[in-house]
């Protein structure tokens, strides 16, 4: 079959729309007709060269849609089911899935290669194999993916909104609730309140934090964060640190969450300094893997028992937490509709990312 997709051929170039050949589902695979795709900053790391994938690759790793066809042996979904895609597949049988760390599933090893777990590809054109970002390629009308990459959701939920819980919402919310282990009465500092960080605000608020202090240079994002539950907002880290010192009587924050678009050593150092004894720094944002971004005093960590840790997918369980977050939304306890700043069609994908670069969007969504 044929499908239109937004393809990246090399770093530094825009996405190109083209028609590709798409294989139908094999054993354990499903054909998804995508309804919506989120414009996440992680795809910008491909275009900027920070995360070098195998080119060419169909972009997009935040998606929702309807199952059109299933291959042999598929048990998780059936044709007609509404699904949200998880950018980390979860097999349920590897060491990490079996010990409750489904976000680290071994099937995620090829997410930048864009191939299926057996090394084969489902997108092709004129003899060339095209990868799919995170084995999903949601910047396409249709895709064939593993059944382990989709999560069935209630069919009365709007897929254009549900798409957000495939990456940005759990990554941010879980950074606060799971990785940050925030509790009632805590003080949290959040660096970067875009598509991920704004959901860390929601997570910290849901956890019962007394103070949620955000840092972002973009005024629009700071204003939005205050509407989502932040108690204080600052354009720079130094001003935020001074306020935290005042609010906590010099004790420091309980957790500092780093969700900026590109992590550097400056923000990591600021986060490590703003937490108090026994505090935790969680790094969820990405950077060029070849660059060292953690330069802190080991003595400070030892004497004050501070922790610096990373978090992938908000340390969530995709099969459980995607459904849980949508139920919170359905109950009016999680804001999703308010996250969508602008909707685009597939032809506008590059404009959507330019708007993201310009700080105009909390979250842009492509509606297929």
Swiss-Prot record:
GO cellular component labels: cytosol; peptidoglycan-based cell wall
Cofactor note: Binds 2 Zn(2+) ions per subunit.
GO molecular-function terms, A-Z: alcohol dehydrogenase (NAD+) activity; S-(hydroxymethyl)glutathione dehydrogenase [NAD(P)+] activity; zinc ion binding
Residues reported to bind Zn(2+) 1: 40, 61, 167
Conditions for induction: Expression is controlled by VirS. Induced at acidic pH and in macrophages.
This enzyme's EC code(s): 1.1.1.1
Binding site residues for Zn(2+) 2: 91, 94, 97, 105
The entry's keywords: Metal-binding, NAD, Oxidoreductase, Zinc
InterPro entries for this protein: ADH-like_C (IPR013149), ADH-like_N (IPR013154), ADH_Zn_actinomycetes (IPR023921), ADH_Zn_CS (IPR002328), GroES-like_sf (IPR011032), NAD(P)-bd_dom_sf (IPR036291), PKS_ER (IPR020843)
Disulfide bond keyword on record: no
Annotated GO biological process: biological process involved in interaction with host; formaldehyde catabolic process; response to acidic pH
One Pfam short name: ADH_N
Protein name, per record: Putative alcohol dehydrogenase D
Organism: Mycobacterium tuberculosis (strain ATCC 25618 / H37Rv)
């Amino acid at each position: 079959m044929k499908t239109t997709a937004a393809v990246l051929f090399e770093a530094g170039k825009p996405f190109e729309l083209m028609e590709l050949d798409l294989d139908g589902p094999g054993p354990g695979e499903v054909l998804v007709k995508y309804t919506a795709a989120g414009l996440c900053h992680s795809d910008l790391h491909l275009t900027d060269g920070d995360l070098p994938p195998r080119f060419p690759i169909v972009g997009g790793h935040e998606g929702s849609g309807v199952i059109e066809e299933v291959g042999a042996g598929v048990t998780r979904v059936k044709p007609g089911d509404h699904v949200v895609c998880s950018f980390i597949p979860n097999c349920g049988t590897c060491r990490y899935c079996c010990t409750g760390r489904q976000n680290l599933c071994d099937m995620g090893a090829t997410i930048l290669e864009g191939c299926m777990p057996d090394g084969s590809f489902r997108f092709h054109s004129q003899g060339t194999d095209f990868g799919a970002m995170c084995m999903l390629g949601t910047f396409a009308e249709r895709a064939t993916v593993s059944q382990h990459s989709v999560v069935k959701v209630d069919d009365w939920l709007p897929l254009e909104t549900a798409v957000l819980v495939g990456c940005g919402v759990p990554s941010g919310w879980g950074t606060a609730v799971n990785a940050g282990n925030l509790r009632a009465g805590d003080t949290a500092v959040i660096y970067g309140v875009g598509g991920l960080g704004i959901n860390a605000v929601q997570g910290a608020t849901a956890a019962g934090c007394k103070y949620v202090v955000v840092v972002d240079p973009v005024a629009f994002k700071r204003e939005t964060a205050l509407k989502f539950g932040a108690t204080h907002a600052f354009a720079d880290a130094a001003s935020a640190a001074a306020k935290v010192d005042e609010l906590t009587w010099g004790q420091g924050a309980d957790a500092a969450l780093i969700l900026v678009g590109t992590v550097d050593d400056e923000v990591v150092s600021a986060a490590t300094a703003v937490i108090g004894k026994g505090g935790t720094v969680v790094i969820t944002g990405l950077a060029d893997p070849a660059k060292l971004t953690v330069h802190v005093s080991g003595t400070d960590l030892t004497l004050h028992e501070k922790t610096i840790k990373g978090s992938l997918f908000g340390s969530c369980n995709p099969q459980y937490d995607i459904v849980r977050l949508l139920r919170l939304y359905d109950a009016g306890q999680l804001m999703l509709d308010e996250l969508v700043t602008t909707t685009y069609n597939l032809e506008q994908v590059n404009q959507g990312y330019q708007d993201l670069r310009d700080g105009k969007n909390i979250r842009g969504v492509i509606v297929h």
